[in-house]
């Protein structure tokens, strides 16, 4: 984390979780003037049993009081709906699998929230992300966290130079275990609070039930890769490539007991295509194309580019060669076949510890 002048005001996005809480504490103990910002991105009924926003706000207030910083509540639900949620609905409707966290970081946390922090007099916005920012002659690099298991650079790959220049990740150099230990030692009420998982606006409710509230499901056939109908699906928007659960196919006399997996979605025919066995060859691909390219540095890399890539956040880095197709498309050739490459997800590129940027798999 860079050293700033002691009289600078830094705003911290306090979510009620342990990571942002310790991020605020680290800044406070370094002598900065810290203010907390709690985002409300989703309008919910206070009686909604699946929404944790009320408890999260209560935890954020308790932490702010404990540390001794002011906390402001800001509502970005309209911006979130327009710039994140509507985009996700469009992607689901077209049979793709979007990543809301990627868009939320670019459009809400490091845009709307950063702008709000500036209006309050803050010079920078800090969050509890596990990532690092390095300034090299006023060019900002996004680096992986010291905790490889918690690294979140994948979700931050759409950030630009302005956003990185005005952001701080105070716990990027910490291990998650260290963060929890600090929180416990300081008596934070959320020191053992579990990490949030899944899609933020769905919470713990069933994905299918939630999506049904906004999109019209169209049931259709489930076919094998040979074109044989073996079942019915509830709507292809509910499924993603590599998925096993929820197919309700089971073992078949003519196919044995090996489980079935989604291998593709034929949107035009409204057909879900499946194959049998986790290691089925059709679940693997050695190449992909991507669009909506974004490079974090102002100058994009030279092509063809030999680097590492991830097609999902917890995947180990994979060696690949990236080739420019046009201004907005790249071809990615992997050294080894990759399982369950999914349209709508992000492919993110790395050179060593540096996140270069990425694109959307299509």
UniProtKB/Swiss-Prot annotation:
Cystines in this chain: 104-200
Site (described: Interaction with tRNA): 129, 345
Domain of life: Bacteria
Catalytic activity: S-sulfanyl-L-cysteinyl-[protein] + uridine(34) in tRNA + AH2 + ATP = 2-thiouridine(34) in tRNA + L-cysteinyl-[protein] + A + AMP + diphosphate + H(+)
Annotated compartments: Cytoplasm
CDD domains: MnmA_TRMU-like (cd01998)
GO terms classed as biological process: tRNA wobble position uridine thiolation
Gene Ontology CC annotation, any one: cytoplasm
Keyword line: ATP-binding, Cytoplasm, Disulfide bond, Nucleotide-binding, RNA-binding, Transferase, tRNA processing, tRNA-binding
Catalytic residues (UniProt): 104, 200
Family named by the database record: Belongs to the MnmA/TRMU family.
HAMAP family the UniProt entry points to: tRNA_thiouridyl_MnmA
Function: Catalyzes the 2-thiolation of uridine at the wobble position (U34) of tRNA, leading to the formation of s(2)U34.
PANTHER family listed in its UniProt record: MITOCHONDRIAL TRNA-SPECIFIC 2-THIOURIDYLASE 1, TRNA 5-METHYLAMINOMETHYL-2-THIOURIDYLATE -METHYLTRANSFERASE
Name of the protein in question: tRNA-specific 2-thiouridylase MnmA
Organism: Coxiella burnetii (strain RSA 331 / Henzerling II)
């Amino acid at each position: 984390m860079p050293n700033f002048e002691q009289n600078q005001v830094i705003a911290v996005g306090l979510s009620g979780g342990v990571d942002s809480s310790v991020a605020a504490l680290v800044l406070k103990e370094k002598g900065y003037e810290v203010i907390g910002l709690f985002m409300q991105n989703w309008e919910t009924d206070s009686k909604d049993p699946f929404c944790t926003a009320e408890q999260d706000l209560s935890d954020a207030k308790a932490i702010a009081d404990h540390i001794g910083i002011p906390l402001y509540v800001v509502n970005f639900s309209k911006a979130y709906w327009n710039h994140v949620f509507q985009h996700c609905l469009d992607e689901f409707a077209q049979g793709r699998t979007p990543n809301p966290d990627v868009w939320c970081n670019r459009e809400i946390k490091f845009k709307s929230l950063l702008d709000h922090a500036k209006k309050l007099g803050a010079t920078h916005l800090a969050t509890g992300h596990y990532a690092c920012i390095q300034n090299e002659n006023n060019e900002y690099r996004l680096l992986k966290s010291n905790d490889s298991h918690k690294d979140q650079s994948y979700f931050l790959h759409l950030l630009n130079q302005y956003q990185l220049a005005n952001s701080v990740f105070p716990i990027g150099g910490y291990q998650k275990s260290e963060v929890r230990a600090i929180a416990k030692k300081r008596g934070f009420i959320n020191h053992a609070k579990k990490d949030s998982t899944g899609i933020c606006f769905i919470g713990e409710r069933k994905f299918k039930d939630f999506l049904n509230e906004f999109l019209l499901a169209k049931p259709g056939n489930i076919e094998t890769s040979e074109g044989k109908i073996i079942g019915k699906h509830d709507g292809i928007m509910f499924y993603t490539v590599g998925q096993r659960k929820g197919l309700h196919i089971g073992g078949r006399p003519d196919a044995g007991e090996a489980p079935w997996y989604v291998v593709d979605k034929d949107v035009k025919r409204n057909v879900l295509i499946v194959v049998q066995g986790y290691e089925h060859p059709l679940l693997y691909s050695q190449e992909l194309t991507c669009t909506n390219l974004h490079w974090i540095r102002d100058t994009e890399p030279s092509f063809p580019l030999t680097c590492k890539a991830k097609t999902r956040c917890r995947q180990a880095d994979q060696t690949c060669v990236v080739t420019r197709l046009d201004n907005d498309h790249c071809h990615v050739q992997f050294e080894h076949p990759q399982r369950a490459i999914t349209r709508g997800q992000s492919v993110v590129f790395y050179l060593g510890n540096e996140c270069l940027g990425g694109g959307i798999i299509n």
